A protein has these predicted regions:
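Active-site-adjacent helical/loop segments in soluble small-molecule enzymes
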Residues: 72-141
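Glycine-rich phosphate/pyrophosphate-binding loop at beta-loop-alpha junctions
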Residues: 1-82, 136-170
Length: 170
């Protein structure tokens, strides 16, 4: 199985829905589970600091609309709080270039029509690779196997085309 799994967190339902059965099936063999949020709506990180589900005031929207929630669900909190090994917040800076990379098939496995939220895990992975201290903290090594969860395709075809075009120029 994967040594690392990057899970996008909005209200936490999808991440909890993945973690719970994987934990049941794999138990102690479960790899590192890493939550990923937009820094503009990092309600899980805020909840970790407060040690209780907390509301985040969203003053600016992220391109990753599906992650722009501002509040973790109580049920997701009960599952994710003890299950996630790490949680990272990301900016929107890499979204367009990574969407273009998926669209052009540069990551292997062919072309993928990946929407904005689908880049969250890869955005966090790339950021970790650029930060040696974070890379070490996340315990990556030469035999690491990473699972990235993509959550949507081109839900807004016009925005998708715009971001892929912008991403190809970066």
């Amino acid at each position: 199985g994967p040594s690392h799994c990057f899970l996008p967190i909005g209200v936490g339902g999808l991440a909890a829905g993945i973690v719970a059965p994987v934990w049941q099936h794999m138990g102690a063999n479960l790899g590192k589970m890493i939550g990923v949020e937009s820094y503009m709506s990092a309600c899980f990180l805020e909840s970790i600091d407060a040690q209780t589900p907390s509301l985040v005031d969203i003053s600016e929207e992220t391109l990753m609309a599906g992650l722009s929630c501002g509040e973790i669900s109580d049920l997701a909190w009960q599952i994710l709080q003890p299950s996630l090994d790490h949680c990272l917040s990301i900016t929107d800076d890499a979204i367009a270039p990574l969407m273009a990379g998926f669209a052009d098939g540069v990551f292997g496995g062919g072309r993928i029509e990946a929407g904005e939220c689908s880049t969250a895990g890869l955005t966090a992975l790339v950021a970790a690779k650029k930060d040696p201290a974070l890379w070490e903290k996340l315990e990556f090594g030469p035999t690491s196997v990473v699972l990235l969860i993509g959550t949507e395709g081109a839900t807004d075809p016009g925005l998708y085309d715009q971001l892929v075009t912008e991403g190809r120029q970066k």
